[in-house]
């Protein structure tokens, strides 16, 4: 069986390494990106099974990346879990409006993140 592919997008290198390590331990293939423009290109090229997406990114913010993917017939099926330090209700609402499936606030518990990933990939 082919490994499920997850794209992790965040400009915090250490966080990306930690998430990547945890996901690989669970048996997932992990792609990484540190800016929105690259994330969009990778998502279109690799067609991942799930995207973990930060909001505050260089080049193209997470809201725009999410919106561009969710309003494209070819990619709208990909679950997107937004990860962010933004905790206000208006930020969560904006995340939902762009089509994000889930909104996870930082700092988050890695076990909780892994459970959310499993939930979306087993649907």
Identify the residue ranges that each predicted region occupies:
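C-terminal output helix
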Residues: 108-117
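Short hydrophobic/Thr-rich beta-strand motif most characteristic of the beta2 strand and flanking loop
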Residues: 27-34, 42
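The feature encodes the CheY-like receiver
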Residues: 16, 58, 76, 88
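Active-site beta3 strand of CheY-like receiver
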Residues: 46-52, 57
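Charged docking surfaces used in two-component/phosphorelay signaling
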Residues: 17-25
